[in-house]
Amino acid sequence: MSDLLSRRLALLGAAANLPLLTECLHGIERECLRVDSDGKLALTPHPRALGSTLTHPQITTDYSEALLEFITPTETDVADTLGDLERIHRFASSKLDGEYLWSPSMPCELPDEESIPIARYGSSMIGRLKYVYRKGLALRYGKTMQCIAGIHYNFSLPERLWPLLRQAEGSELSERDYQSAAYIALIRNFRRYSWLLMYLFGASPALDAGFLRGRPSQLERLDEHTLYLPYATSLRMSDLGYQNNAQAGLTPCYNDLQSYIDSLRQAVSTPYPPYEKVGTKQDGEWVQLNTNILQIENEYYSSIRPKRVTYTGERPVQALAARGVQYVEVRCLDINPFLPLGIDLDEARFLDAFLLFCAFSDSPLLNGECSDATDNFLAVVKEGRRPGLQLQRRGQPVELQVWANELLERIADTAALLDRARGGEAHAAALAAQRAKVADAELTPSAQVLKVMRERGESFEAFSLRQSREHAEYFRQHPLAAEEQARFEKMASDSLAEQTELERDQDGDFDTFVAAYQASILGLISN
């Protein structure tokens, strides 16, 4: 164990401080496509019974009208977070009228690009802005890529913990700057070690052959309708996904918060010639919010983001600049198609131990390690289960299995501390489940997906639809209690009323609204 990690764990293990570790906050966002009874993309509007996608706090859409997003409230106990997520699923599932929630991350058979419906948010200024932003995404990246779903895991350490560490380490940074620097250090370590999450939890080794739209690839054919790679863990996170020339040169620096803010601010204010050629309007209709490298900060695709809860009308980078980092959003997790919620307690508890390990371990600046971190990540998503696969560690080759076992040995100390804080051995058990996967790659979700498809002679689509139906049956057999159902019904109707009020009360024109929104980022100049 590194000196810094052992010192921090000893400090937090003291009787007076141990309860702090029960105050970490968790939130989960789960995306999933709506599909019809045959497993094809649902072309129906967002069910009104689920409420307004603009104003509902827990049920919205991501890119497409058919791409649902479920958002839990924050909880200190991740078991409660998963309970929240299950209740959202139960309610939504009861309102789908013969449609299903698609079980994996990679999409079902999709119609042609033109027919994939972009999410609608009504006629308010902000609703129209969200729609135009998505039109811009279609223009820049194509609609097909935007139909990939994932799980986002939001995690924060208790605010009371940072002053304790800052004082113990004699830092001269302000409390806010110390906290931000610590989260950025967590992100640097996440970049170093996130390949491990791809090995353990990647669950997208195969996809529907039509997804590539005829483009050449290195993928192999499993059957007439399915492409795959034999040792892949997460094709979702491979370079099949969100690769784009405009973003290729955009590598936000994780050396400190200000440089990260500056790089994103530059990207949302720097024109990109191919986008300039298209312009923001065609035949008087908006087609993208601007012609810059990024329309808004959230367009930047990354496996983890520093975050701060925003005020109404505030942009993410403004919130970070004004008040510092509050939590991290892990964005690289596949949906496990065997699980009704796409994630379970073992995975969540391991993520907590992993993120605490990243937060408390020594985290030097990445500098030359950046390319190694990217190469390791891409190697694991494409061939993570290949026997003897070698990664790069500080410029030297190391076998994945050797490095994974060493990391799990170190993460065991944070898992043990979490168990001491909460009582029981749940985190140790979650860690043991991951050790078993490192010892035997056949236990990983990606291997299990291919195993079941081969054993049953199923295409990707047939496997996924069967799992989707099984999950729907699970939710049907576990309906919400009447009181909970009524609470969700009220949340839906309240959100519809709120959207109606927004649309009634607005004035001004959309062009002026967009101009003001664009201008809001330009004041964030580094001091």
Curated annotation (Swiss-Prot):
Cited Pfam families: Glu_cys_ligase
Q: Which SUPFAM superfamilies match?
A: Glutamine synthetase/guanido kinase (SSF55931)
**Catalyzed reactions per annotation:** L-cysteine + L-glutamate + ATP = gamma-L-glutamyl-L-cysteine + ADP + phosphate + H(+)
Which Gene Ontology molecular-function terms are recorded? ATP binding; glutamate-cysteine ligase activity; metal ion binding
> Which of UniProt's keywords are assigned here?
ATP-binding, Glutathione biosynthesis, Ligase, Nucleotide-binding
**Enzyme Commission designation:** 6.3.2.2
Q: Which InterPro entries match?
A: Gln_synth/guanido_kin_cat_dom, Glu_cys_ligase, Glut_cys_ligase
Gene Ontology biological process: glutathione biosynthetic process
Pathway it works in: Sulfur metabolism; glutathione biosynthesis; glutathione from L-cysteine and L-glutamate: step 1/2
Does the record carry Protease as a key word? no
Any one of the GO CC terms: cytosol
Query: To which protein family does this belong?
Result: Belongs to the glutamate--cysteine ligase type 1 family. Type 1 subfamily.
According to UniProt, the name of this protein is Glutamate--cysteine ligase
What is the organism of origin for this protein? Pseudomonas aeruginosa (strain ATCC 15692 / DSM 22644 / CIP 104116 / JCM 14847 / LMG 12228 / 1C / PRS 101 / PAO1)
Q: Which gene encodes it?
A: gshA
